[in-house]
Amino acid sequence: MDQPRQSSTASQPPETPPQPSDSKPSTLTQIQPTPSTNPSPSSVVSSIPSSPAPQSPSLNPNPNPPQYTRPVTSPATQQQQHLSQPLVRPPPQAYSRPWQQHSSYTHFSSASSPLLSSSSAPASSSSSLPISGQQRGGMAIGVPASPIPSPSPTPSQHSPSAFPGSFGQQYGGLGRGTVGMSEATSNTSSPQVRMMQGTQGIGMMGTLGSGSQIRPSGMTQHQQRPTQSSLRPASSTSTQSPVAQNFQGHSLMRPSPISSPNVQSTGASQQSLQAINQPWLSSTPQGKPPLPPPSYRPQVNSPSMQQRPHIPQQHISTSAATPQPQQQQSQQQHQPQEQLQQLRSPQQPLAHPHQPTRVQGLVNQKVTSPVMPSQPPVAQPGNHAKTVSAETEPSDDRILGKRSIHELLQQIDPSEKLDPEVEDILSDIAEDFVESITTFGCSLAKHRKSDILEAKDILLHVERNWNIRPPGFSSDEFKTFRKPLTTDIHKERLAAIKKSVTATEAANARNQFGHGTANARGGQAKTPSNPMGSTTFNH
């Protein structure tokens, strides 16, 4: 850890004599009397924290100011590095981060030698841009309230401070104007950031943290803001305002550096906007820093050039969102058009056939009108149909028509056919049967003294007189005794069966008697081998 810092600061001429110090106010007083022709970053750094020193340190979580210092091996170089951490930052060099060094959140680390050896113009802009990083809200969601000291990089550099320089650096996911760091500074700050990320284990949003590094004489950030803004040169404020506007236009939670509470109070709303407009913050893993899109990496000094890449993104996003309803509308428009075309297309072919039919009808009328004999044959089928319907009308009025007779005949035997005389006889029998049933049922209804003919009246007549039990209308529930009705044919069959039975019995009796006498005559000399068997088999 010490070697990269010493190498980065080797090119710097020490502006102050090496005087070891134990507290930050002493280091500030040592840096203040150094004269410099150009407003170098070290002079700006020394002037900024020295003015708010007499303010009340009551808001500081740790009341002891000397705990914010670190004993350093090389006092001149290390003091400048520690003081330039929260304040001195490089000029706006786009969002091109050196991610290849695997150093997450290196934008708040110590400044390198090129930063301190810059000219006066970059110094003013760099001194104004980093200060805006401290003015942003220092709230970090999920950060424990108790101070967590980070382990010292080397045994010689013991950090008794409760809030070391790399404590607030690990929660700044996106660069706040100071992401253009050198490789040396990124290498120096990467182990501290990794160690703190390992101990904390909190995946934070990129811009929730703030550059809360070493604070001189127990000052808070809110106390430093008015003094920092008052000590800025006019050029820094003029150059910073368009850049801050550009940051706000990109919804990166970068309020303007002017010390106004209204701008700083909009952090929550900008956090919500950032969560919406920058989904890569929540989707990135915990230990790896999120890579911004390529549109945010190039940074231009002019506000017009900075705002231009954002405008096409808005158009692209809106155009990406609008094609879906446009496509839906176009599909909805195409569907009725297709339906109309489909409706019109059948109508057109139908309209064309109608015309030939009309022409054919006219031709037929012209052809048939002079020819008189052709009309009577056309009228004859109608007359024939009328005669056929007249013949079928009386049969249709009957209960059992010829159609029903043919259907019954087809069910019995499809090959059989009935003569018309037989069909008439069957229809007459059906009519007589229905009339007899209705008359007897009406008589039963009158006997019950009711004007309505019910099903039980007809069932009583049908079951008793005709021995017919129609399915679904049986009267078994109210009629327990059923009288057997025998016909003459049935009686004749029963008589024939009885005669046959008697004849068989008589024949069997004759055969048994003859077989018994023969056995008696032939069995006088010989005894039967099985005398019981003959009797049993005969009987």
From Swiss-Prot:
Q: Where is the composition biased (Pro residues)?
A: 51-68, 287-296
Report the residue ranges that make up the Histone-fold domain in this protein: 397-470
Q: Where is the composition biased (Polar residues)?
A: 1-13, 70-84, 183-192, 210-249, 257-286, 298-307, 362-372, 526-539
Q: List all Low complexity biased stretches.
A: 30-50, 103-130, 323-350
Described purpose of this protein according to its UniProt entry: TAFs are components of the transcription factor IID (TFIID) complex that is essential for mediating regulation of RNA polymerase transcription.
Q: What is its quaternary makeup?
A: Component of the TFIID complex. TFIID is composed of TATA binding protein (TBP) and a number of TBP-associated factors (TAFs) whose MWs range from 14-217 kDa. Can homodimerize. Interacts with TAF4, TAF4B, TAF8, TAF11, TAF12B, TAF13 and TAF14.
Q: What is this protein called?
A: Transcription initiation factor TFIID subunit 12
Q: Which organism is it from?
A: Arabidopsis thaliana (Mouse-ear cress)
State the organism's lineage.
Answer: Eukaryota, Viridiplantae, Streptophyta, Embryophyta, Tracheophyta
